[in-house]
Regions:
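Positively charged n-region of N-terminal signal peptides that target proteins for export
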Residues: 1-4
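Bacterial N-terminal signal peptides
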Residues: 7-15
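Processing junctions and N-termini across compartments
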Residues: 13, 31-32, 89
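N-terminal leader/targeting segments
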Residues: 20-85
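Broad, structure-driven detector of short, well-ordered beta-strand segments within folded domains
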Residues: 74, 82-89, 153-163
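Long, charged/polar, surface-exposed segments that mediate recognition or autoinhibition
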Residues: 79-141
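Glycine-rich, aromatic-bearing surface loops/beta-hairpins
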Residues: 137-182
């Protein structure tokens, strides 16, 4: 467990030292988490599974909430004040990260910075920017793709945030490779 836990915790905290507030630190930690897991390993999620194998997992019934009825695994990533969750689906190029508490504005700013740092051969395409209210709780959804000419496979990054302090999740990102046929 220490093989993955120590590097992951270092990655989560390396930039946090410079954060001006707890909200910024939480957003920075969340951003570091999905950058160092979902984005970094999107082309080889089996390698990410191997790195996560020693972290605790959610029981199947609780993991189902994060897996949208798909088969996969949800790992608990220790973090204060609350742990993060990393989810990988078994049969899809799909990785997601969840934060119970995070500053929506900071998470969105850091997400946009990450989207605009796509490798130079990719074109960045914004595909969604919507706000909706469900049961009195407002959420904001942003979606971007990194596209290559003549390539049907497109890394897609969907961020959803909420400013509602009662929301079960204030930030989550889904990172998946989709094809033109999907």
């Amino acid at each position: 467990m220490q093989k993955i836990l120590i590097p992951l915790l270092i990655a989560l905290t390396c930039h946090a030292t410079f954060a001006a507030s707890d909200a910024e630190k939480q957003a920075e930690d969340f951003t570091n988490l999905y950058n160092n897991t979902c984005i970094q390993y999107l082309a080889d999620l089996d390698k990410l599974r191997e790195k996560l194998k020693d972290l605790p997992t959610l029981p199947v019934e609780k993991a189902a909430l994060f897996l949208a009825k798909e088969k996969g695994t949800a790992w608990i990533v220790p973090h204060q004040p609350e742990p993060f969750i990393i989810v990988l689906m078994d049969n899809r190029d799909y990785c997601a990260a969840f934060a119970h508490r995070a500053d929506a504005a900071q998470v969105e700013k850091q997400y946009l910075d990450a989207m605009n740092r796509a490798p130079k051969e990719f074109t960045v395409v914004k595909s969604e920017d919507e706000t909706e209210t469900v049961d009195g709780s407002e959420s904001h959804k942003l979606s971007y793709q990194w596209q290559l000419p003549d390539n049907p496979r497109k890394p897609t990054f969907i961020l959803t945030t909420s400013t509602d302090p009662k929301a079960g999740l204030q930030a989550y990102i889904i990172i998946a490779t989709v094809t033109d046929e999907e």
